[in-house]
Amino acid sequence: MYKRQIQEYEALFDESTVFLVRSQGVGYAKPEEMINHGVTGPNVRAAGVDYDVRWAHPYSVYSELDWQPSVERSSIKGADCYDRYRVRVEEMRMSASMVLQALDKMPGGSETYHEPGDPKILAKAPSRAPEGTYGSHHFEDSRGESMFYIAGGGEGRGKMPYRVSIRSPMFITIPYAAKCMIGYKVADIPAIMGSFDPCIGETDR
């Protein structure tokens, strides 16, 4: 049903003259510029850059699933609003496929089932983060590459870490998206910014 709905929405947009006029040839973003600015995720894949953290550095169960990053082959000018729309449509299809594969591979039986709120499925936090210890991890979220860095604070801080640093993809992407508005009409700004899928809460962190 979900895949059928994607197809319906896709046809709705792709058959809309207004949508095509307002998205094609608008808000070009060059792949080399995005790489230099640190832009990741579907925005850079829309420009033909084949990079996805889940594919390049597999974690969790991604290596056990049959999938490939959704990458658009944009024009020499770079990716426009329509390219960014296209890559997200393909990502929805791929995500649905990955969820179905994960459900098929998920072990069954009463031993693996827990009621919502069961303490067995809740993460157990350590009593404290020892001083001098640290950890970092990067992963792919819906808008690009995220990274968390945590440094332990020792006994004096209880469970509170000494330092937490977050690298969110939108914090990097939004300043670059503003550059893509140069030379276009004021009326194009909502389409250009919206095509980058901004999240103000993530940007503010």
Residues covered by each model-derived region:
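Metal/cofactor-centered catalytic core regions of large enzymes
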Residues: 3-205
